[in-house]
């Protein structure tokens, strides 16, 4: 064990001498209070340490003790419903242990509860051959999630002993006979946060991640195992969009990282989620959620740790064959922490003062998303989707964090402050957003909704783009100067914007929209477009289109229950539009 001495302190950065024999990214205990830190730079005898706790009051001459291990997380039953800080310290347990609403410095509480007993049900027998990643048993962790206990990476052999009953996470549940002797398996594993967890093979992202949000699913779809960025200026709805994703996404587990954002936003999640029902299981949303709270007033160095802690927890659930959504709000705050520490290290600054390695750090994080064949002898697939919010100052998408993120992710949901001011939510700008997964996921949509899904989607997108081109002319000379066909396009584009793209996050029906309902809503609007064009071509007055009563039905369809809408309302509306538009023809 290396024991050094502090010689310099600069905010969260501490320099210690006498650290020969230490390793990069080794966790150290700093000062008399034993603050947690991580070595980020080594010279022959000196180590530069980023400290994950407040450094006020520590002084040169105090000791620095190496632990010999990298920054790691504890993985096992007890993570769901938990709330951690950036280095996986359980906030509720710290409050109980210290009887304080603040985190005392140097506090050391285990990440997983050591006194809770979990009912372990074995799924293998003595004598069975097992590989790393094999499931040896299960624990019913919450009402929603059955936690699968895996053979740790690096252990292959034969089951020598397997137990059944109630155990804590530290008690042995299995003994595996390997070539290097017997290995004891507990329900808890430790894993270094900076090292991606291995898998057999990465699979192509061809299944859409259904979010229930029409603009995201239909127009800018994200695939399971994909990565997406949500950049937007302040007040444009990044956090509400991420809350909606956490509530409604077609995943088994949600890891929500509050990385340097306001404490009130984390409070909102903690207060809302225990009362909300999960659409898939009918249980509470909190039962499938892991919260990592690293708010703006916490030490900046821990922002980087919180991102890596979150993705490692997500990969662990992925290895069980589950689907995981990781939302990070906001990666800009992590980048700002990197900039601050880089400045204190006196490194050469890159663009706008960010370190030169900004893009490689972002890439390391986003590249850990993916749909994989999990380790183990059986065929098991899991995925991690990453949705990172970006907060560009002044909504400038050309700044380094946004531009580097866009090089890495394939889905870009651009939030627009102008749309938010017009009360258009979700405020995702359909002209600047894009998804590069559309060709990959189109097959799923065609198979599960309708063969013409891609045609309808592309036509609708074309109408919205055409409307943007016509707006300049309309502002100069008014809509009456346009040809009849283009007046129809303006009317249908308005219907698409107001009745399809807008969605009420607080309405019990409209908050979530299924793929079939999305497809049928789009089909109704595009059928109205084609029939309106026919009517106008046969002499109908385009000004009278806005007076037909079927338009009111179209405006109300998002509030209709799905079954009633698809079975009865869609045929009724198509029949009604035929008769009403037919009556307009002279």
UniProtKB/Swiss-Prot annotation:
<keyword id="KW-1278">Translocase</keyword>
<dbReference type="GO" id="GO:0005886">
    <property type="term" value="C:plasma membrane"/>
</dbReference>
<keyword id="KW-1003">Cell membrane</keyword>
<feature type="binding site">
    <location>
        <begin position="232"/>
        <end position="239"/>
    </location>
    <ligand>
        <name>ATP</name>
    </ligand>
</feature>
<dbReference type="InterPro" id="IPR055190">
    <property type="entry name" value="ATP-synt_VA_C"/>
</dbReference>
<protein>
    <recommendedName>
        <fullName>A-type ATP synthase subunit A</fullName>
        <ecNumber>7.1.2.2</ecNumber>
    </recommendedName>
</protein>
<keyword id="KW-0066">ATP synthesis</keyword>
<dbReference type="Pfam" id="PF02874">
    <property type="entry name" value="ATP-synt_ab_N"/>
</dbReference>
<dbReference type="InterPro" id="IPR004100">
    <property type="entry name" value="ATPase_F1/V1/A1_a/bsu_N"/>
</dbReference>
<dbReference type="InterPro" id="IPR036121">
    <property type="entry name" value="ATPase_F1/V1/A1_a/bsu_N_sf"/>
</dbReference>
<comment type="subunit">
    <text>Has multiple subunits with at least A(3), B(3), C, D, E, F, H, I and proteolipid K(x).</text>
</comment>
<dbReference type="InterPro" id="IPR027417">
    <property type="entry name" value="P-loop_NTPase"/>
</dbReference>
<dbReference type="GO" id="GO:0033178">
    <property type="term" value="C:proton-transporting two-sector ATPase complex, catalytic domain"/>
</dbReference>
<keyword id="KW-0375">Hydrogen ion transport</keyword>
<keyword id="KW-0472">Membrane</keyword>
<comment type="similarity">
    <text>Belongs to the ATPase alpha/beta chains family.</text>
</comment>
<dbReference type="InterPro" id="IPR000194">
    <property type="entry name" value="ATPase_F1/V1/A1_a/bsu_nucl-bd"/>
</dbReference>
<dbReference type="GO" id="GO:0046933">
    <property type="term" value="F:proton-transporting ATP synthase activity, rotational mechanism"/>
</dbReference>
<keyword id="KW-0813">Transport</keyword>
<comment type="function">
    <text>Component of the A-type ATP synthase that produces ATP from ADP in the presence of a proton gradient across the membrane. The A chain is the catalytic subunit.</text>
</comment>
<dbReference type="InterPro" id="IPR020003">
    <property type="entry name" value="ATPase_a/bsu_AS"/>
</dbReference>
<dbReference type="Pfam" id="PF00006">
    <property type="entry name" value="ATP-synt_ab"/>
</dbReference>
<dbReference type="GO" id="GO:0042777">
    <property type="term" value="P:proton motive force-driven plasma membrane ATP synthesis"/>
</dbReference>
<dbReference type="InterPro" id="IPR024034">
    <property type="entry name" value="ATPase_F1/V1_b/a_C"/>
</dbReference>
<dbReference type="Pfam" id="PF22919">
    <property type="entry name" value="ATP-synt_VA_C"/>
</dbReference>
<keyword id="KW-0406">Ion transport</keyword>
<dbReference type="InterPro" id="IPR022878">
    <property type="entry name" value="V-ATPase_asu"/>
</dbReference>
<keyword id="KW-0547">Nucleotide-binding</keyword>
<dbReference type="GO" id="GO:0005524">
    <property type="term" value="F:ATP binding"/>
</dbReference>
<dbReference type="InterPro" id="IPR031686">
    <property type="entry name" value="ATP-synth_a_Xtn"/>
</dbReference>
<dbReference type="Pfam" id="PF16886">
    <property type="entry name" value="ATP-synt_ab_Xtn"/>
</dbReference>
<dbReference type="InterPro" id="IPR023366">
    <property type="entry name" value="ATP_synth_asu-like_sf"/>
</dbReference>
<keyword id="KW-0067">ATP-binding</keyword>
<dbReference type="GO" id="GO:0046961">
    <property type="term" value="F:proton-transporting ATPase activity, rotational mechanism"/>
</dbReference>
<dbReference type="InterPro" id="IPR005726">
    <property type="entry name" value="ATP_synth_asu_arc"/>
</dbReference>
């Amino acid at each position: 064990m290396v024991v050094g001495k502090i010689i310099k302190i600069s905010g969260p950065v501490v320099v210690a001498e006498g650290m020969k024999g230490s390793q990069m990214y080794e966790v150290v205990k700093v000062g008399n209070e034993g603050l947690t830190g991580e070595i980020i730079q080594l010279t022959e005898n000196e180590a530069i340490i980023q400290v994950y706790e407040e450094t006020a009051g520590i002084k040169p001459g105090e000791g620095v003790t190496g632990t010999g291990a990298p920054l790691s997380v504890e993985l096992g039953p007890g993570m769901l419903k938990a709330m951690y800080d950036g280095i996986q310290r359980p906030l509720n347990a710290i409050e109980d242990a210290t009887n304080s609403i603040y985190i005392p410095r140097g506090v050391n509480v285990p990440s997983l509860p050591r006194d809770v007993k979990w009912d372990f049900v074995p799924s293998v027998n003595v004598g069975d051959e097992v590989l790393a990643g094999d499931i040896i048993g299960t624990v019913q962790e919450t009402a929603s999630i059955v936690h699968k206990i895996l053979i740790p990476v690096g252990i292959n052999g034969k089951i020598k002993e397997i137990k059944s009953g109630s155990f804590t996470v530290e008690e042995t549940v299995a003994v595996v006979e390997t070539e290097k002797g017997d290995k004891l398996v507990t329900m808890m594993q430790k894993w270094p946060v900076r090292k991606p967890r291995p898998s057999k093979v990465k699979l192509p992202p061809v299944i859409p991640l259904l979010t229930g949000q029409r603009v995201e699913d239909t127009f800018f779809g994200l695939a399971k195992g994909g990565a997406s960025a949500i950049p937007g200026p302040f007040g444009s709805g990044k956090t509400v969009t991420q809350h909606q994703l956490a509530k409604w996404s077609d995943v088994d587990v949600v890891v929500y990282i509050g990385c340097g954002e306001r404490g009130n936003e984390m409070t909102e999640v903690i207060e809302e989620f225990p009362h909300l029902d999960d659409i898939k299981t009918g249980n509470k949303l909190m039962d499938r959620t892991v919260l990592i709270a690293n708010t703006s007033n916490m030490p900046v160095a821990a922002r980087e740790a919180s991102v890596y802690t979150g993705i490692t927890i997500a990969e662990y659930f992925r290895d069980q064959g589950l689907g995981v959504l990781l939302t990070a709000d906001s990666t800009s705050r992590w980048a700002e922490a990197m900039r601050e520490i880089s400045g204190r290290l006196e490194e050469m600054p890159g663009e706008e003062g960010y370190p030169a390695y900004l893009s490689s750090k972002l890439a390391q994080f986003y590249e850990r998303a993916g749909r994989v064949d999990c380790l183990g002898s059986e065929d098991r697939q899991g995925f991690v989707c990453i949705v990172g919010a970006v907060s560009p100052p002044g909504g400038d998408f050309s700044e380094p964090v946004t531009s580097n993120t866009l090089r890495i992710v394939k889905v870009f949901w651009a939030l627009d402050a102008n749309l938010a001011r017009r009360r258009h939510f979700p405020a995702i700008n359909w002209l600047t957003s894009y998804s590069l997964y559309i060709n990959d996921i189109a097959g799923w949509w065609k198979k599960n909704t309708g063969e013409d899904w891609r045609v309808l989607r592309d036509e609708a997108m074309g109408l919205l783009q055409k409307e943007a081109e016509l707006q300049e002319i309309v502002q100069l000379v008014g809509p009456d100067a346009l040809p009849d066909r283009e007046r129809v396009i303006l009317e249908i584009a308005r219907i698409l914007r107001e009745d399809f793209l807008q969605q009420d996050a607080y309405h019990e029906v409209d908050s979530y929209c299924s793929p079939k309902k999305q497809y049928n809503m789009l089909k109704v609007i595009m059928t109205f477009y084609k029939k309106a064009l026919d009517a106008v071509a046969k002499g109908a007055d385009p000004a009278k289109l806005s007076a037909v009563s079927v338009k009111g039905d179209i405006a109300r369809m998002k509030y209709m229950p799905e079954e009633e809408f698809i079975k009865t309302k869609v045929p009724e509306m198509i029949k009604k539009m035929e008769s009403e538009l037919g009556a307009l023809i002279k």
